Curated annotation (Swiss-Prot):
Basic and acidic residues composition-biased segments: 39-50
Cellular-component GO terms for this entry: nucleolus; nucleus; small-subunit processome
BP GO terms, sorted: ribosomal small subunit biogenesis
The protein, known as: RNA-binding protein PNO1
Compartment annotation: Nucleus, Nucleolus
Gene symbol of the encoding locus: Pno1
Ranges annotated as spanning the membrane: none
InterPro entries reported for this sequence: KH-I_PNO1_first, KH_dom, KH_dom_type_1_sf, KH_PNO1_2nd
Function: Part of the small subunit (SSU) processome, first precursor of the small eukaryotic ribosomal subunit. During the assembly of the SSU processome in the nucleolus, many ribosome biogenesis factors, an RNA chaperone and ribosomal proteins associate with the nascent pre-rRNA and work in concert to generate RNA folding, modifications, rearrangements and cleavage as well as targeted degradation of pre-ribosomal RNA by the RNA exosome. Positively regulates dimethylation of two adjacent adenosines in the loop of a conserved hairpin near the 3'-end of 18S rRNA.
Region (Disordered): 1-63
Organism, as annotated: Rattus norvegicus
Alphabetical keyword list: Nucleus, RNA-binding
CDD domains the UniProt entry points to: KH-I_PNO1_rpt1 (cd22391), KH-I_PNO1_rpt2 (cd22392)
Amino acid sequence: METQNTGTEDGFTPVTHRGGRRAKKRQAEQSSAAGQDGDAGRMDTEEARPAKRPVFPPLSGDQLLTGKEETRKIPVPANRYTPLKENWMKIFTPIVEHLGLQIRFNLKSRNVEIRTCKDTKDVSALTKAADFVKAFVLGFQVEDALALIRLDDLFLESFEITDVKPLKGDHLSRAIGRIAGKGGKTKFTIENVTRTRIVLADVKVHILGSFQNIKMARTAICNLILGNPPSKVYGNIRAVASRSADRF
């Protein structure tokens, strides 16, 4: 009675829940489910965290070349058949002995075919050999083209005179004459100052050298095509060459 009186005095009547066990069970299930969700979220975050950066040992040349044999084909124009035949041993020797590649001239397709083999140790050997043969086919001397195998920072660049200025007829012939000069003097001067090698084949110009030197030679040739006098071009390239020499 006292408890009832206190309950009535407070304004509340005590109520005993019959489903106490069910409520406890329900609360336990909810808490366990919430715990599992928390664990799952924690696992997701742990999986989402980037692991330590993997460190792999560098592969050797033999492991890199364990795939199929790679082949490069370089087409040879008709005007280069005779020079290729005369200089075949000079081309064959460095490619086979130094680079460890196989090379042959396919008489049916008129292509020089180069491929890797078991003796190939360097991955870049095939690209170097292809550039070497391509340079010779474009008209460079074997000794000059051989630098593509020995040095890594040499490149080939080709463009046409008509790409610089759309010339035709006698105007085109005069532009070619300005690039070559009397007895090849202008071409040799540009080669010596810029330390490049230049091949002038009709309307096509091929330049062999480093990136910066090719840029200087190309600028000089473009100025000659556009009509600048050779003396002015000489002065410009000498000034640029001296500045680049001081810089390095």
